[in-house]
Curated annotation (Swiss-Prot):
Carboxylation allows a single lysine to coordinate two nickel ions. Residues 133-568 form the Urease domain. Gene3D superfamilies: Metal-dependent hydrolases (3.20.20.140), Urease, subunit C, domain 1 (2.30.40.10). It is an enzyme of class 3 (hydrolase). Pathway: Nitrogen metabolism; urea degradation; CO(2) and NH(3) from urea (urease route): step 1/1. Pfam families: Amidohydro_1 (PF01979), Urease_alpha (PF00449). Belongs to the metallo-dependent hydrolases superfamily. Urease alpha subunit family. The active site is at residue 324. It is found in: Cytoplasm. GO terms for biological process: urea catabolic process. PANTHER family: UREASE. CDD domains: Urease_alpha. This is Urease subunit alpha. It comes from Deinococcus radiodurans (strain ATCC 13939 / DSM 20539 / JCM 16871 / CCUG 27074 / LMG 4051 / NBRC 15346 / NCIMB 9279 / VKM B-1422 / R1).
């Protein structure tokens, strides 16, 4: 029996050779492999395959290691490692198998770990794109409402610092000291995401920093508003080396304690995560962007400058004034703000992402960044670069390489940078089943279904009083996995190994997981985003050159994944 490609796609989703458009962008992905078996596909529904004795085993029980708790059928997986069609199994909250699901008693080729039984739930992935949950590593914990906004956008892990709408938190991503760290670990345990806290890294001696790591901080944050001097940089990195944690840095915009060359010397070849590496969010003016080419620097962007549009420059001045407690009535404050907002370096940032020089995307939530737009702006930037720069080699009739490069920026690479990639960051066996399902038409804008630890934690849901789930108004709403004790069973708090072993962490009900392998990594470990070119900035014109060639792009006045999808 033969069916047309269109009929097959309608039944089971796209297969090898089919292309899928992502949202209303110009990006197309093509199915590279199909791990399901033609003629033996599993699908749930009336008159379909997953029924007792057909696609569902009559005898297998949950005690069988091959029986998953959940199967996502016929999903199109988009991850840094490829674009494939497969069934995905989840057991005990973790991805247990990727391949072909079904009943080995009646079907050939069922992948070990994907035997569907009476204890197996089904999520219909036909026609949907499956990605890993996003990892946002630049969170100012100003308001708990951020967490719901981030979750409903497809982010499942938040790393940063803060204690609420205080002056320190509104400007800097630090949770200072043991008391604040423990109270925030207790507070965040009530929310259905994974969390990690950055301690305050600004001290020129090591003891005040080390005690925060032992208290459970998963890393340290250096911020210029607290004084990012070469001595503080050296002390923070020295503690990080001792405890195997990451250091994130916002360098000295005013160049008061040194220039970018002094910061590089203080790094001394040690691994460091540079926030908003373009500089509008802060950092040595005008040339902090140079560090993106260093092998020990893990560079990220924050999303308000991404991608470069006709409104980017105008909104940044007011944004900066509010976030850093500046006054438009004080000339020195105005000059400080203007020194950080440079069209030339912002224009270069888009291209450096496309070249794989900038490795990560993040939000800078409510502190010059939008917590619910990390994923959207990543794909807007990818679209803009395809339109302005053309296909990205080796792409041809589809944009698989570009899509894999960009999805890595908010999934696997931030997870690697902060030592949590053994738990989250990709669609791979053994990792937490933090997964996001997208209708292709809404890809990058509005997830259909968000799974946290293998359970649906949020979804597009219609009127609760309707006779079916789909009547308007349809918008993202928390689901059962967001309530009661479920978040404790499906979510993690990431802490230092020293904090975990010290025995002094508060009993918050959820599992702690220690970060690891943050010091033996470098730019080479940033998946598909590991380029280390020579970057130079003209100190008078601010033009950016990469290996001697001018790098720039034009701002755009229209983007996809925007007004068509959102009223506000």
């Amino acid at each position: 029996m033969k069916v047309s490609r269109q009929q097959y796609a309608d039944l089971y989703g796209p297969t090898v050779g089919d292309r899928v458009r992502l949202g209303d962008t110009e990006l197309l992905i093509e199915v590279e492999r199909d791990l399901t078996t033609y003629g033996e596909e599993v699908k749930f529904g009336g008159g379909k395959v997953i029924r007792d004795g057909l696609g569902q085993s009559s005898a297998a029980t949950r005690d069988d290691a091959n029986v998953p708790d959940l199967v996502i059928t016929n999903a199109l997986i988009l991850d840094y490692w490829g674009v494939i069609k497969a069934d995905v199994g989840v057991k005990n909250g973790r991805i247990s198998a990727i391949g072909k699901a079904g009943n080995p008693g009646t079907q050939d080729g069922v992948t070990p770990g994907l035997t569907i039984a009476a204890s197996t739930e089904i999520v219909a992935g036909e026609g949907l794109v499956l990605t890993a949950g996003g990892v946002d590593t630049h969170i100012h914990f100003i308001a708990p409402q951020q967490c719901w906004t981030a979750l409903e956008s497809g982010v499942t892990t938040m790393i940063g610092g803060g204690t609420g709408p205080t002056a320190g938190t509104s400007a800097t991503t630090c949770t200072p000291g043991q008391w604040h760290i423990h109270r925030m670990l207790e507070s965040l345990a009530g929310l259905p995401l994974n969390f990690g806290l950055l301690g305050k890294g600004n001290a020129s001696t090591q003891p005040p920093l080390a005690e925060q790591i032992r208290a459970g901080a998963l890393g340290l944050k250096l911020h210029e508003d607290w004084g990012t001097t070469p001595a503080a940089i050296h002390a923070a990195l020295s503690v990080a080396e001792d405890y195997d944690v990451q250091v994130a840095i916002h360098t000295d915009t005013l160049n008061e304690s040194g220039f970018v060359e002094d910061a590089i010397r203080a790094f001394a070849g040690r691994t460091i995560h540079t926030f908003h590496t373009e500089g509008a969010g802060g950092g040595h003016a005008p040339d902090i962007i140079r560090v993106a080419g260093l092998p020990n620097v893990l560079p990220s962007s924050t999303n308000p400058t991404m991608p470069f549009t006709v409104n980017t420059i105008h909104e940044h001045l007011d944004m900066l004034m509010v976030c850093h407690h500046l006054s438009p009535r004080i000339p020195e404050d105005v000059h400080f703000a203007e020194s950080r907002i440079r069209p030339e370096t912002i224009a270069a940032e888009d291209v450096l992402h496309d070249l794989g020089v900038f490795s990560m995307m993040s939000s800078d939530s409510q502190a010059m960044g939008r917590v619910g737009e990390v994923i959207t702006r990543t794909w807007q930037a990818a679209h803009k670069m395809k339109v302005q720069r053309g296909p990205l080699a080796p792409d041809g009739r589809a944009d698989n390489f570009r899509a894999r490069r960009y999805v890595a920026k908010y999934t696997i690479n931030p997870a690697i940078a902060h030592g949590i990639s053994h738990e989250v960051g990709s669609v791979e066996v053994g990792k937490l089943a933090d997964l996001v399902l997208w209708s292709p038409a809404f890809f990058g804008a509005k997830p259909s279904l968000i799974l946290k630890g293998g359970l649906v934690v949020a979804a597009q849901m219609g009127d609760a009083n309707a006779s079916i789930p789909t009547p308007q108004p349809v918008y993202p709403r928390p689901m059962f996995a967001a309530y009661g004790g479920c978040p404790d069973a499906t979510c993690l708090h990431f802490v230092s190994q020293a904090g975990l072993e010290g025995g002094h962490l508060p009993d918050v009900g959820r599992r702690y997981s220690a970060v690891k392998h943050t010091r033996d990594i470098g730019k080479k470990d940033m998946q598909l985003n590991a380029e280390t070119p020579d970057i130079q900035v003209n100190p008078e014109t601010y033009e950016v050159r990469v290996n001697g060639e001018l790098v720039t792009c034009e701002p755009v006045d229209e983007l996809p994944l925007a007004q068509k999808y959102f009223l506000f």
